[in-house]
């Protein structure tokens, strides 16, 4: 039996003045599916994410979203005058308590910093707090907007492993916007490549988890995606 998509876009257009950002884009995301969105700068990734977050409305087309959504941005945007646990439950309905926040912080291995002030957190800790803030909302759709781009290499790998583990536990539908092909291949079930506001290619990733960049299938798919993004051509011309 086919599952009803948790996200459904059909012939979505988005224009700002005379500039077309998304042009007839159609995309479904199944419950529990992990989708990575790749594309060059200006391809429409951020515009699509803003539509899925409910921050903008499309100029034209059909868009169906779940009620419970959460976004983790590259910058966690924690309020410096509220301690970590209060940031985690900020805006949550039904009078959430410190216990709710600590439970979410425990999932991201940050419960020991519940009473800390945001400015005392490292970059990785702040991003963990951002993930906890998303988890406490029990989202049907989790949107990740290049959440690891500002982190050092080791912290980025640790955060990727954490996101993979959280997805295995919760099986929330996820859309990850990233420029990192390896990150997309490590985490996602499916990769969508945007170009000029349209879906230029989609690839299902059938490589068993846990995945390793050194595996032949991983390396082959990486080369294919780099080619779709124009990276190999740029390197060859350099």
UniProtKB/Swiss-Prot annotation:
Q: Does this UniProt record's set of keywords contain Cell membrane?
A: yes
Q: Which GO terms describe its cellular component?
A: plasma membrane
Q: Which InterPro entries match?
A: AAA+_ATPase, ABC_transporter-like_ATP-bd, ABC_transporter-like_CS, ABC_transporter_ATP-bind, P-loop_NTPase
Protein residues bound to ATP? 39-46
The reply to whether Cell membrane figures as a keyword in the UniProt entry is yes
Where can this protein be found? Cell inner membrane
GO molecular function terms listed in the Swiss-Prot or TrEMBL record = ATP binding; ATP hydrolysis activity
What family is this protein classified in? Belongs to the ABC transporter superfamily. Aliphatic sulfonates importer (TC 3.A.1.17.2) family.
The entry's protein name is Aliphatic sulfonates import ATP-binding protein SsuB
The record lists the organism as Granulibacter bethesdensis (strain ATCC BAA-1260 / CGDNIH1)
Q: Which gene encodes it?
A: ssuB
